[in-house]
Swiss-Prot record:
Organism ancestry: Eukaryota, Viridiplantae, Streptophyta, Embryophyta, Tracheophyta
Protein name: Putative multidrug resistance protein
Membrane topology recorded in Swiss-Prot or TrEMBL: Multi-pass membrane protein
Ranges annotated as biased composition (Low complexity): 620-641
UniProt-annotated stretches for the region Disordered: 610-654
Keywords: ATP-binding, Glycoprotein, Membrane, Nucleotide-binding, Repeat, Transmembrane, Transmembrane helix, Transport
Ligand binding (ATP 2): G1032, Q1033, S1034, G1035, S1036, G1037, K1038, S1039
Record-annotated ABC transporter domain positions: 359-595, 999-1233
Annotated ATP 1 binding sites: G394, G395, S396, G397, S398, G399, K400, S401
Entry superkingdom: Eukaryota
Organism: Oryza sativa subsp. japonica
Localization per Swiss-Prot or TrEMBL: Membrane
Glycosylation sites: N145, N354, N771
Membrane spanning stretches: 35-55, 83-103, 158-180, 184-206, 264-284, 296-316, 679-699, 717-737, 797-817, 821-841, 897-917
GO terms under cellular component: membrane
């Protein structure tokens, strides 16, 4: 460190050092022990080199003074050769300790760090994530990349630094002991050796940080596109996405070029070594002539000085990794240390002995931190008596959900207080407070684990009986027990394997298991169909007995039994009282809301209510049924049927090690840079042997007796050294800049090609477990980067190594073939050692990377569902799951550390042994007068220094090993043929469509669960220009029809025709331009509202955008926002309410002016007021287009031209509303309508 501190001044060094200590923050006692042993090993390993030089100096002196008395000469050489063998044994032990201990402790600390980081992230308050600080992408990068950076520094860089520091100290000790004059004079040259490395570290670290920050943007774009592939496809926005992605990558590439240049200057300035040799050689010759020192000693000391300086330089070059690691560790620590304003971990605060559950809001002021300029509550008051049910109704954005968010303490009010049992909730212990409340929200968050685990989130220590009881209460027990794996069925990422209704019931079971005093239902039934809704509603009524319940509902029918109904409008309670009282006031807000919701047939109040919700499921439904087992099937298949497993097998073994040539072909446009770079690398390869030759010749000059001759030759060789120094500087800049440019453009090209390719894959591909958005994104981030270093740094290295080896071997054989042959023969031993290490590391890197992906998936999921985790205080549980996912990597790493130790030990000691052999054999050849001392020195220097070059290249092979895997996985993506080609050039591109859809004899099952048949011989025709409604229970196949019309999936048998032409004959992207899709959970992208509306429509004027927004009834609310159409939507549109998102999604579909409009439960998630407006908008838009409407709320589809009733994948009835109702009790439709109205009638009694 000393040199570094001196160079940078104490003030600068201190923070670097203290921040570097954060890397070790996560070590425990065992780690400290391992690190101490590792430290000893690394120091021993470092000192072995100067000791080797000491022994060498003696051998050189023996050899140089000539073989006068053969016998004595041989025995001297032999003794020293034997000493080298002893040294080899010692260095084996040391290097083993160095390799083993550090590798072992690195993994331990990194995994502890990951867990702590995740714990800290989960501890943050909701506000932290609202303020764009912690988008999911960032957390994933930190869990995977940052912790890997730290692990890498601990396992490789720290020991390397210590070893070099020891080598530096040892070398100068040897130098002063043997020849203090030379050492003293040459001491200042150390500074020259260090400065380049040091400056370089500084500049590069800055660049590295900027490059990393730069990649977060393209990363976020990719994450959104992949996680919302259906939306991207249906709006044909692949091009738009790619354009944004490329633009975001452009900046990274520019920074990368700067990095290449900086690298070249830095590495090139190492040419200073040669200049230093020039000086040492000249001064050494004077010492030999005038002070009578021996040539071997002069050589050994000169070598020690340079070796020591270089060791210090390369030790300090690790400093740049240290600063990378410390900034990674700091980033992680910053989160770990951040105490959120609302701290779920804190144990301060009181607990009430017994909670009655009275809730009161008193003069509350509040605005969301991300939009401080739009206050939600100005002075909000509401009292909920203990044990009563209060329903909040009102338009979108009136502040209903905010009430729940404040009560759960996701946020704190800026003024006023929220009280439970008369105590301000800020005074209560947070975990305890949340334990008193059960939250069921509109979009239930499930975790990718089993159903049982999901329910246990409610209460950790619940028994199996309690879980079943909770599931029964939530009406979930029956469908769970029908799944092949029952409660152990895996739910899939974000719960995709389950239908909406199923997810919701699991979420309710989770809340019930908690047996909370206060139950918070945020639209808990809005996503269910009539039947599930009735059951769930009963479950909720049961659950809310004797509890304080706050219900938010759009469907008024569901809340008529509430004790108090609070009607909210723009953040105030406008009316308060029971249903009968409020409905009596004809001009009141409530009675008008109820009238709004009444069915067109004025049949009864609020069919909508009930139904409304139903709706949602519908959508899921189709998936649902299908999905229903999906999970099951997935897991089962994985285990029993082996489907999934097969998938894997077919994919995994097919990753052949890709040909490097193919990678280079991707780089073809940069052929000029490739030529320049390769040429520079070849020349640079030759510099090493040339220098060694001069070096060897120089040693023999020292043993000459004629002073004039010594002076003359010294001058020649000194000039050669200076020339090499200049050449090396220029050549390196050429090499690094050119290869850097190749690498950057290659990375950009690979990322673009991969994403472009992924966006052609059929939707079924995204449904697979291994293709979760998290996994794909980390592949885009990491693999492309690895490939860059493969081309940029490794390829240069390979070329220069090959060039150096060929030149050196040729020279060696020409000068002294006997010795050269022996030396060349033992080189492979060293290489094999490094190679063995590399192969072992390769097989390991695979396993640990797989394990990493598992854990980043978990982390991503946890962050997406932060509110749920917070509300259930289930951070511990998530962390336990995370711990389990770390088990695999832990076992792996233990084996890895053994191999690391053995490999390092063997390769280090073998090198010393080969030196021993060379000297012994060289001595014999000299004794037999086969070669002169000069030839021995030259050959030895040339081949040994080349051995070092190969060894260095060998140490890079670990990166090559990682690289090969990355390249394979990149090509696996690029080579995969999609099963549904979105852009078939032969496909028909319609100018416009009539919109006639004909589905004939279709058999269908979702690819992720081929064993669950959705349709068998299904037939349906949809008339052009007419609206067709699909109704039916969950799982009857409604959404599947929409998936088939969009061609997200292909049927197994049968055909889907549009305008009489098989859908497979169309160019899919051209076809999708004429189809507009509005689904239940609208996907908005991070960007402004305007960007979201024009999404996929490249050209649209301002007027068209506003018209579309007006038609979707969104113009007014958009114009009221502070930034209007330029308002930022946030990640996945979190800044907007459900109704607002939905209207933007509708505007987006309208702007497309589609011939076929698909509405998959488009209004299910809205409250009555927004729903009426949106419904009117949809009715307007549907005129003159083919429309396919999936709805649960039957009131919304009475005006459709044709209503098709589905049951279990078959059409059971079709006709208009009137004709179907006329069938009376025998009709399925009639009974569905009745069910929905019956709901209301019961309510009335």
């Amino acid at each position: 460190m000393g040199g570094g501190d001196g160079g940078a001044g104490k003030a600068k060094a201190r923070p670097v050092f203290s921040s570097f200590m954060t890397v070790f923050m996560h070590a425990d006692a065992a780690d400290v022990a391992l690190m101490v042993l590792g430290l000893l090993g690394a120091m021993g390993d470092g000192i072995s080199t100067p000791v080797m030089l000491l022994i060498t100096s003696r051998i050189f002196n023996d050899l140089g003074s000539g073989a006068d008395i053969v016998k004595e000469f041989s025995s001297k050489v032999n003794v020293n050769a034997r000493n080298l063998v002893f040294l080899a044994a010692a260095s084996w032990v040391m290097a083993f300790l160095e390799g083993y201990c550090w590798a072992r402790t690195a993994e331990r600390q990194a995994s502890r760090m990951r867990a702590r980081y995740l714990r800290a992230v989960l501890r943050q308050d909701v506000e932290y994530f609202d303020l764009k600080k912690g988008s999911t992408a960032e957390v994933i990068t930190s869990v995977s990349n940052d912790s890997l950076v730290v692990q890498d520094v601990l396992s490789e860089k720290v020991p390397n630094f210590v070893m070099n520091a020891a080598m530096f100290a040892g070398s100068y000790a040897v130098g002063f002991a043997l020849l203090w004059r030379l050492t003293l004079v040459a001491l200042p040259s150390v500074v020259l050796l260090i400065i380049p490395g040091f400056m370089y570290g500084r500049i590069l670290v800055g660049l590295a940080r900027r490059i990393r920050e730069q990649y977060t943007r393209p990363g976020a774009i990719a994450e959104q596109a992949v996680s919302s592939a259906r939306t991207v496809y249906s709006f044909v926005a692949e091009r738009t996405t790619m354009a944004q992605f490329s633009a975001a990558l452009e900046e990274s590439a520019r920074l990368g070029l700067k990095q290449g240049l900086a690298k070249g200057i830095a590495v090139g300035s190492n040419g200073i070594t040669f200049a230093i040799w020039a000086f040492n050689v000249w001064y050494g010759s004077r010492l030999v002539m005038y002070h009578g020192y021996q040539g071997g000693t002069v050589f050994a000391v000169s070598a020690a000085i340079v070796v020591g300086g270089l060791a210090l330089g390369s030790g300090l070059s690790n400093v740049k990794y240290f600063s990378e690691a410390s900034s990674a560790a700091e980033r992680i620590l910053e989160v770990i240390r951040r105490v959120p304003k609302i701290d779920s971990e804190s144990d301060t605060g009181e607990e009430l002995a017994n909670v009655t559950g009275e809730v009161e809001f008193r003069n509350v002021e509040f605005c969301y931190p991300s939009r401080p300029e739009s206050p939600i509550f100005v002075s909000f008051n509401l009292r909920v008596p203990a044990g009563r049910t209060v329903a909040l109704v009102g338009g979108s954005g009136s502040g209903k959900s905010t009430v729940i968010a404040l009560l759960e303490r996701f946020y704190d009010p800026s003024a006023g207080e929220v009280m439970v049992d008369g105590v301000d909730i800020r005074r209560l212990r947070l975990k305890w407070l949340r334990a008193q409340m059960g939250l069921v929200s509109q979009e239930p968050a499930l975790f990718a684990t089993s159903i049982r685990e999901n329910i246990l989130f409610g209460k950790e220590e619940a028994t199996a009986e309690e879980v079943v009881a909770a599931a029964k209460a939530a009406n979930a027990h029956n469908f769970i027990s029908q799944l092949p794996q029952g409660y152990d069925t895996q739910v899939g990422e974000r719960g995709v394997q389950m239908s909406g209704g199923q997810k919701q019931r699991i979420a309710i079971a989770r809340a019930i298991l908690k047996s909370p005093k206060i139950l918070l239902l945020d639209e808990a039934t809005s996503a269910l169909d009539t039947e599930s809704e009735r059951v769930v509603q009963e479950a909720l009524d049961l659950a809310s007995m004797g509890r304080t319940t706050i219900v938010i509902a759009h469907r008024l029918s569901t809340i008529r039994n509430a004790d108090i109904i609070a009607v909210m409008q723009s953040g105030e309670v406008k009316e308060l009282g029971p249903h009968d009282e409020l409905i009596a006031n004809d001009n009141g807000l409530y009675s008008s809301l109820v009238r709004l919701q009444q069915t067109r047939d004025s049949n009864e109040i609020d069919e909508i209510g009930v139904t409304g919700s139903t709706s949602a499921v519908g959508q899921s439904s189709s998936h649902s049924m299908s999905r229903r087992f999906s999970a099951a099937s997935r897991s089962s298949s994985a285990r029993s049927l082996g489907d999934a497993r097969d998938d894997d097998n077919t994919e995994k073994p097919k990753l052949p090690v890709p040909s490097f040539r193919r990678l280079l072909m991707l780089n073809a446009p940069e052929w000029k840079q490739a030529l320049m770079g390769s040429f520079s690398a070849v020349v640079f390869g030759g510099i090493q042997p040339a220098y060694a030759y001069a070096m060897g010749s120089m040693i023999s000059v020292y043993f000459l007796t004629d002073h004039a001759e010594i002076k003359d030759k010294t001058r020649t060789y000194a000039l050669i050294f200076v020339g090499l120094a200049v050449l090396s500087f220029l050549i390196n800049i050429g090499q690094h800049y050119n290869f850097g440019a190749m690498g950057e453009y290659l990375t950009k090209r690979i990322r673009e090609q991969m994403l472009a390719k992924i966006l052609t894959f059929e939707i079924g591909w995204f449904d697979r477990d291994e293709n979760s958005s998290g996994a794909i994104c980390s592949q885009l981030a990491k693999d492309a980067n690895v490939v860059r270093s493969l081309v940029g740094d490794r390829m240069a290295l390979v070329i220069q190594t090959i060039s150096a080896v060929l030149i050196a071997c040729t020279m060696g054989l020409v000068i002294a073939w006997r010795l050269a042959l022996v030396m060349i023969a033992v080189q492979p031993l060293i290489i094999v050692c490094f190679y063995a290490r590399r192969v072992l590391l390769k097989s390991m890197s695979k396993k640990s990377i797989h394990a990493q992906a598992e854990s980043s998936k978990l982390a991503a999921e946890a962050v997406s569902n932060l509110r749920t985790i917070t509300a259930f205080s289930s951070q511990e549980r998530i962390l336990r799951l995370f711990e389990q996912s770390q088990d695999g990597p832990r076992k792996e790493s233990i084996r890895q550390s053994w191999f690391a130790g053995l490999g390092l030990g063997t390769s280090m000691s073998l090198m010393t042994c080969t030196w021993a052999l060379d000297f012994w054999y060289g001595g014999r050849l000299m004794a037999e007068h086969h070669i002169s001392a000069k030839e021995l020195f030259q050959t030895f220097m040339i081949l040994v220094s080349t051995g070092r070059v190969i060894a260095d290249a060998g140490s890079m092979t670990t990166d090559l090993a990682k690289g090969a895997d990355a390249v394979a996985s990149v090509f696996a993506v690029l080579d995969r043929e999609t099963e549904i080609d979105p852009d078939n050039p032969q496909g028909y591109k319609p100018e416009k469509l009539k919109g006639e859809v004909d589905i004939r004899g279709v058999d269908f099952a979702y690819p992720s669960r081929p064993d669950v048949i959705i349709f068998k011989g299904f037939t349906l025709s949809i008339q052009p220009g007419k609206s067709t409604a699909l109704v039916g229970q969950s799982g009857s196949g409604k959404s599947t029809i929409i998936g088939l019309i969009e061609r997200f999936y292909d049927p197994i048998r049968g055909s889907v025709k549009i305008d009489g032409r098989d859908i497979k004959a169309y160019n899919l992207r051209a076809l999708r331009r004429h189809i507009g899709l509005v689904s239940q959970e609208p996907t908005l992208f991070a960007g402004t509202i305007r960007e979201n509306i024009v999404y996929g429509t490249e050209t649209a004027s301002e007027a068209e955008i506003e018209d579309a927004a007006r038609s979707a009834n969104a113009h007014d609310f958009i114009s009221n926002l502070k930034d209007g159409y330029d308002t930022w939507c946030g990640e996945r549109g979190v800044q907007l309410s459900g109704g607002q998102k939905q209207r933007i999604a509708i505007a987006r579909a309208i702007l497309k002016n589609p011939a076929i409009l698909l509405l998959d439960e488009a209004t299910s998630a809205l409250d009555s007021q927004s729903e009426k407006v949106v419904q009117e908008a949809l009715d307007r838009v549907m005129i003159g287009r083919t429309s396919v409407v999936v709805a649960h709320r039957l009131s919304t589809i009475q005006n459709c031209d044709l209503i098709t009733v589905l049951e279990k994948g078959t059409v059971v009835e079709k006709g208009t509303h009137a004709s179907l109702m006329a069938k009376g009790l025998s009709g399925t439709y009639f009974s569905l309508v009745n069910l929905q109205q019956g709901g209301n009638q019961q309510v009335q009694h």
